Curated annotation (Swiss-Prot):
Pfam families: MIP (PF00230). Belongs to the MIP/aquaporin (TC 1.A.8) family. The chain crosses the membrane at residues 47-69, 270-298, 308-333, 344-369, 435-462, 514-536. Its main location: membrane. This is Aquaporin-2. It comes from Plasmodium berghei (strain Anka). It catalyses: H2O(in) = H2O(out); glycerol(in) = glycerol(out).
Length: 595
């Protein structure tokens, strides 16, 4: 009876959880439908276009810079399993060279059991022993030749100076002595080599005891047939761009691509990180988001202002711009850039780096957003440029030298203050430019610099992307290379039918599951940052009843009648000015006030 009671209790809990989730989904869909009915999306078209252009330029410039700087460098394939170095199409990395060569990410070659590749190491030892033996034989032969020449000279002198038969018989005796010396040297050489071979066998026996039964099987790399190897066995195998592009997607997890240690001075990671962060901050000044994680963070912190549909459209245009830019760069320059952001082996480490970095960066951006909002509220009553329409009508010519003064009611190059204070004394600056946007940049320069150096630290030190749009663009470009450009022709139907293959579908699913931390980490970090900011948010904001009149109905006389009773919602007080500004000032869509 107790077990049945517990089972019924768990069933009731499950039903309650399902009903709660279903209710949340229904309410969310209802809000989306109301937003679609109420919102006029045409007024956001310039914002969507700006997000598309900003994302395209951001990804395009960084990709071009990195691809163009690294396209002539040699890269290295490192196989993660034990490999026989003397087989064709295999790649071998000697244990000694791993520690001597300064290459990031190099590790000892170990199999699944954690045991070193003893067969390969023994082969290298035998190779080195043979080289030493050949060198010793060469020195011994030279020594024997010198002894033989000395004996020959002594024998000829004795033949010329002596006539007796006893002296003539000494010649073969000396030859016998020389041959005995040579035989003794060879005997000593054989003894040394036998001792060395015995020691090697003893050492090999000590290793072989701990080996498993399947360690004698050879593991070949059959999917890298076009790799051009160097002559020396104990060096990394260097490859070019075309060899990387010809790899098989199925076996890609078995290898690791590294940069040659001799070319490490040509690495421009710090330069393009600085360049990318600078572009990002410049677009933040212009008012773009460029980061879907930050866009959804703004929606979470103020859902009434942005709306789920508007936020999704923002992110969609960001993704489209980034993907097109990445594919265009890969089509022009190659695909080296793709392999720098492929899924990492350490999933949790990647997720934590992306999560923590995006969490801290989103807090900075949201603080910057709140500071912008306060700046707008504090400066909303200041005088701006006033456009005098009456003077334009009375102007004789638009090409007048005083056209600016006629339009804006004062001269931009005036040395007097526009306000009648201190009897219009001269200002310190010779050019007085009363523009709130310049004031906005000057007042926010500290935040912008702080965000810039924070971005530079996260990208350069932790090697994280901080942007799911950037990671998704890279992955889509990788698939473009594998399934489109490999055929040297673009045929939509052939590409579509090639994706219907069950094997390719499974490969893509596995590939994207492994790369989930590249975009789940930023989204999770930004979501936690919004909840953290809401803990310190003032909930006592002024709420007014605002009627959204973006949707109208027409009567028989073709008069516009607002749907007053249909779309009635509560907004924050400052949103009334926001909606009026965006509706009646269409020429200022890209102004910072909108964001």
């Amino acid at each position: 009876m107790k077990t049945k009671g517990r089972l019924l209790l768990y069933i009731n809990y499950a039903k309650y959880a399902i009903k709660a989730c279903f209710k949340i989904i229904i309410n969310h869909i209802k809000d989306i439908r109301e937003e679609i009915n109420v919102k006029s999306f045409s007024k956001y078209k310039y914002n969507f276009l700006f997000e598309f252009i900003g994302s395209f330029i951001f990804v395009f410039l960084i990709s071009v810079y990195m691809l163009n700087s690294n396209q002539n460098e040699e890269y290295i394939i490192k196989h993660l399993n034990q490999i026989n170095p003397y087989k064709k199409n295999d790649i071998f990395i000697n244990e000694v060279n791993i520690h001597n060569n300064d290459i990031n990410g190099s590790e000892d070659i170990r199999n699944a059991s954690g045991i070193k590749n003893i067969n390969s190491i023994n082969d290298v030892k035998m190779y080195e022993a043979r080289a030493l033996l050949n060198q010793g034989n060469k020195q011994l032969k030279e020594q024997n030749d010198t002894i033989f020449e000395k004996n020959k000279i002594n024998n000829t002198e004795k033949i010329e100076n002596s006539i007796s038969e006893e002296k003539e018989q000494t010649i073969p005796n000396t030859n016998e002595d020389s041959t005995t010396i040579v035989n003794d040297n060879k005997r000593e050489e054989d003894e040394v080599t036998n001792i060395g071979e015995k020691n090697d066998k003893i050492n090999e026996a000590a290793y072989i005891i701990s080996l498993p039964k399947d360690s004698n099987k050879e593991k070949l790399t059959k999917d890298i047939d076009e790799v051009i190897f160097k002559d020396k066995v104990n060096e990394y195998s260097k490859i070019k761009l075309d060899d990387i592009n010809n790899m098989d997607l199925k076996k890609f997890d078995d290898i690791k691509i590294l940069k040659d240690s001799s070319n490490k001075n040509n690495s421009n990671h710090a330069i393009y990180s600085f360049f990318g962060c600078l572009i990002y901050v410049l677009f933040i000044i212009l008012g773009a988001h460029i980061n879907p994680a930050y866009t959804y963070a703004l929606w979470l912190i103020e859902p009434q202002k942005y709306g789920f549909v508007i936020t999704t459209l923002y992110a969609t245009f960001q993704y489209i711009g980034g993907i097109l830019a990445s594919i265009l760069c890969a089509h022009i320059y190659g695909s080296i850039f793709i392999y720098s952001l492929l899924p990492r082996k350490h999933i949790m480490k990647t997720f934590l780096c992306e999560f923590v970095s995006t969490f801290l960066l989103t807090i900075l951006l949201l603080s910057f957003y709140n500071y912008k909002k306060l700046f707008k509220e504090e400066n909303q009553n200041e005088e701006e440029f006033s456009f005098n329409k009456e003077k334009i009508k009375n102007m004789s010519s638009l090409y007048s030298s005083h056209s600016f003064e006629d339009i804006y009611e004062y001269d931009i190059f005036s040395t007097y203050s526009t306000n009648s204070t201190n009897n219009n004394k001269y200002k310190k600056l010779f050019i007085y430019f009363d523009n709130k946007y310049i004031k906005y940049i000057i007042n926010h320069i500290f935040y912008l610099l702080f965000i810039f150096f924070s971005l530079l630290f996260f990208v350069f030190v932790t090697n994280t992307t901080l942007n799911p749009m950037f990671s998704t663009s890279t992955l889509c470009t990788y698939l473009y290379f594998k399934y489109v450009q490999s055929n040297n022709s673009f045929n939509f139907f052939s590409i579509f039918f090639s994706f219907l293959s069950l094997g390719k579908i499974i490969q893509i699913i596995i590939f994207y599951i492994k790369s989930l931390p590249l975009w789940i980490g930023p989204y999770a970090g930004s979501a936690c940052a919004t909840f953290f900011m809401k803990l310190f948010k003032d909930n006592n904001e002024e709420i007014v009843n605002v009627i959204d009149t973006n949707v109208y109905s027409h009567n028989r006389t073709k008069e516009k009648m607002p749907l007053i009773n249909t779309n009635n919602m509560n907004h924050n007080a400052y949103l009334e000015e926001y909606n009026d500004h965006i509706c009646y000032n269409s020429n200022n869509y890209l102004n910072y006030k909108i964001f």
